[in-house]
Design a protein with these regions (language model features):
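Substrate-binding clefts and catalytic carboxylate motifs of secreted carbohydrate-active enzymes
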Residues: 1-156
Length: 156
């Protein structure tokens, strides 16, 4: 899930590969989303060379958003940043035909143990803990209602 294409030892034995990726959050998070996108494409180009037609599924991706936090220009933890991150990530997914699945982390915010990396829990949900939609929920509704049923016919 976290190996890179040139270091993964098990991927050649698998029928498909699954990855957890957070370019723009844990990797190159903040003001440099363009840098995160370029780094993500670089990794994906590497996967294109080693997958030989096998599908790739993203089993985790996302960014935290404190519900109700709005900032312009966008900053990490804001609704605007979460949407910009998701749009960038989806653009990378859509660029590669071998990407055949995506599972956002997470459906809804949830409580975690105390710590400096989480503000009263994990806030990567597209819904709040009370199951109210964040701005990202509307982005996903648009994406999921417009994705083609046959991924081989999607546009790049």
């Amino acid at each position: 899930m976290t190996s890179l294409p040139d270091t993964s030892k098990g991927q050649r034995f698998a029928d498909f590969v699954s990855l957890n990726r957070y370019y723009g959050w844990y990797v190159l998070g903040g003001a440099g989303l363009a840098d995160a996108e370029a780094a993500f494409h670089h990794e994906m180009d590497g996967w294109a060379k080693v997958l030989h037609g096998r599908p790739l599924i993203f089993t985790e991706y996302g960014t935290d958003n404190l519900s109700g936090a709005h900032k312009l220009p966008s900053v990490m933890w804001s609704a605007e940043y979460q949407n910009e991150y998701l749009e960038m990530t989806h653009a990378v997914f859509d660029h590669y035909d071998f990407v055949q699945g995506e599972l956002v982390w997470n459906f809804a915010d949830f409580q975690t143990t105390e710590g400096i990396l989480r503000v009263d829990g994990n806030k990567k949900g597209i819904f709040t803990r009370q199951r109210q939609p964040k701005d990202a929920a509307y982005l996903f509704r648009e994406r999921w209602t417009t994705l083609p049923v046959n991924f081989k016919k999607r546009k790049k």
